[in-house]
């Protein structure tokens, strides 16, 4: 079990996280400044705060990126930050 505030273990993509990423796709495209029609969720970690931070590794047309998406306990998800230029084997860490 992950303690509050700590990053959890890495999980493979699942429907829940894919839906969260899809909900913020316009923001992702705006931050990356490129077409993300082929965006694919690879893996993710979570952090329990006053809601959940999702740290998500995605494959884009240009390589890989890490996303931080915040989802409150009740309400819509929002994109907080993007790290572009990542590699397939880069570990997901807090940013």
From Swiss-Prot:
It is found in: Cytoplasm. GO terms for biological process: regulation of proteolysis. GO terms for cellular component: cytosol. Its main location: cytoplasm. Keywords: Cytoplasm, Protease inhibitor, Thiol protease inhibitor. A motif (Secondary area of contact) lies at residues 47-51. The record marks 5 as: Reactive site. It comes from the Eukaryota. Pfam families: Cystatin. GO terms for molecular function: cysteine-type endopeptidase inhibitor activity. The keyword Cytoplasm applies. The keyword Mitochondrion does not apply. InterPro entries: Cystatin_dom, Cystatin_sf, Prot_inh_stefin. Intracellular thiol proteinase inhibitor. Inhibits cathepsin B, but not papain. Belongs to the cystatin family. This is Cystatin-A2. It comes from Dictyostelium discoideum.
């Amino acid at each position: 079990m992950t303690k509050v505030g700590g990053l959890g273990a890495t999980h493979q993509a699942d429907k829940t996280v894919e839906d969260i990423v899809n909900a913020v796709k316009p923001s992702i495209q705006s931050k990356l400044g490129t077409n993300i029609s082929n965006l694919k969720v690879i893996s993710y970690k979570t952090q329990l705060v006053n809601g959940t931070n999702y740290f998500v590794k995605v494959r884009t047309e240009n390589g890989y990126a890490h996303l931080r998406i915040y989802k409150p306990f009740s309400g819509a998800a929002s994109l907080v930050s993007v790290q572009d230029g990542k590699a397939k084997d880069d570990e997901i860490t807090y940013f």
